[in-house]
Structure formats: C-alpha cells, structure tokens
C-alpha cells in the first residue's frame, strides 16, 4: 500500500473512514491518559478528524501526522482556521493555537519531534494498514515515543477473508504482539458493531467487533 493509494482516496473523496462526529470512545476514555492541560498528544495518520479540534478544546496540545495535503488543508478550512505554515525537516508544518499538523510521511517522524509528547491516540492508523505495514508502523511509533508514554488504541476485528481492507482486521493477539515489549495492555471495551456498519453488512461480513485498549509504557 503506497502513498499514491491514499492520495487517490482523498482526491476522489473516498473517505468512508472519516467520521462526522467526535469518537465516543475518545470522549469516554480520554481521562485514562492522565493528561494535564497543555500536555501534548500525538494523533498518527489523523486525516481531518474532528477529534483533533475536540482534543484541543480539552486544553491539550495536539500533534497530528498526516500524509495527505488535501486532508490537512480540508481540516483547517472546515474549522475556519488560518494556520501558520512552514517546513520542519521533511514535513510541511501547519500551526494554530493548540493544534500542529505535520504533513508528510509518518515514517519520517523522529524522536525529537515527539520530545514533549505524553500520549498518543490511534483510531484509524493501525487498522488502515495491511499486515506487512502494521508491524513496521507499531515499531516506529514505539521507537519515536518518549519513555513512559500512554496510548488509546481503537481496533476492529472481523473475518479478513470476507472483506478486503482497509479498514483491516486487527485481532487482539496481534495488538498484544506489537506492544509486548514493555507495555501494559488493558482492554477497556469490546463490542459487536456489525449492525451499525452498513459497509460491512453489504459485503457479507458475518461478524464485526470493535475494541478499545489503554497502553502504558512502564
């Protein structure tokens, strides 16, 4: 899965993964990240999610990383924001009060970019990637995050043979395998969400679970 795939999805407005509401899991469980006002949270592969503005409204400093320039531009336009734009290493950096978006390749992210980061929130990053990229993504995320980080991770699971991703099925054992080294993993929620996901129903998926994890690096 190359960059051109995602650029084409955004160019053609094929963004079924974008939610027109704040993620309810985020609202329910943000407090578990134990963040204080002014502390920074990373949102990898953030798209133009409304969660960015909501997190900033909670008093946090939000750092999003997104490949698509259109997604980043759309976010600021739809929120009627006029960001300062400059370059930071290999990224185009967009900044307004409380929100910084780095437009570019997630794998170009370096530890110094996240030196002030306390936590991360992943709703649509891990599940957006095919198996061969997920391990690389999780490894790179852990390599650049500071020690003693926390994370809120949302995944889905379904019979992968019944539908081609994205979004991809990420079973529980896979999550625990990626974060086995030095992370405490707590499953906060798991539930059947097939009935409210028409895309999966139309494609004949027989079951669909959504899970939320709290990750803590000790």
UniProtKB/Swiss-Prot annotation:
Residues the record lists as binding S-adenosyl-L-methionine: 10, 45, 66, 123
Major location category of this protein: cytoplasm
Location in the cell: Cytoplasm
PANTHER family on file: THIOPURINE S-METHYLTRANSFERASE (PTHR10259:SF11)
UniProt keyword terms in alphabetical order: Cytoplasm, Methyltransferase, S-adenosyl-L-methionine, Transferase
Listed EC numbers: 2.1.1.67
Xref: PROSITE patterns: SAM_MT_TPMT
GO BP annotations listed: methylation; response to metal ion
Pfam families: TPMT
Gene Ontology cellular-component annotations: cytoplasm
Enzyme class: transferase
Catalyzed chemical reaction(s): S-adenosyl-L-methionine + a thiopurine = S-adenosyl-L-homocysteine + a thiopurine S-methylether
NCBIfam families: PRK13255.1, TMPT_Se_Te
Protein name: Thiopurine S-methyltransferase
UniProt-listed InterPro entries: SAM-dependent_MTases_sf, Thiopur_S-MeTfrase_Se/Te_detox, Thiopurine_S-MeTrfase, TPMT
SUPFAM superfamilies from the UniProt entry: S-adenosyl-L-methionine-dependent methyltransferases
Annotated source species: Pseudomonas aeruginosa (strain LESB58)
GO MF terms, alphabetically ordered: thiopurine S-methyltransferase activity
Family stated for the protein in its record: Belongs to the class I-like SAM-binding methyltransferase superfamily. TPMT family.
